[in-house]
Amino acid sequence: MKIKANKLQIEVEDTGGSGEVVVLIMGLGMQLVAWPVELVQALVQQGYRVIRHDNRDIGLSEKFDHLGTPNLFWESVKFRIGLSTKPPYTLHDMAQDTLGVLDTLGIQRAHIVGASMGGMIAQHVAIAAP
């Protein structure tokens, strides 16, 4: 389902009942469907409510095509030699998207799990809303 979160249209899958919430955040370029179905089912069978979402610019969530595609190699070179980089959005922005999803769904507490870059986003979520 699509929901409005952090002023964006975010694709969300909400599975399970009314137990404790587990948010699964996938990494760079990966959609929510990349989480193994067996993992989601096991969490639900243990009584958890599982929330997965496509990060901004990925899958069925809102795209930022108008910003163009950054050259990741060049951006990493600039970063390594101390030049400034201007990403179209940051990990903090993506963490705010996750918090927006939780707010829209009326969720105040959750366990946050991230894979790869999703783990970096999860750290920003924990910093912003311990």
Which residues fall in each region the model found?
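Conserved hydrolase catalytic core segment
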Residues: 108-130
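Hydrophobic/aromatic ligand-binding patch that stacks against planar heteroaromatic rings
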Residues: 42, 101, 124-128
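Active-site acidic short loop of glycosyltransferases
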Residues: 5, 17-19, 103-109
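Conserved acidic catalytic loop of the alpha/beta-hydrolase fold
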Residues: 79-110
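Conserved HGGG/HGGXW glycine-rich cap/lid loop of the alpha/beta-hydrolase fold
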Residues: 6-80
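Methionine-biased hydrophobic packing positions in alpha-helices, especially
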Residues: 30, 94, 117-120
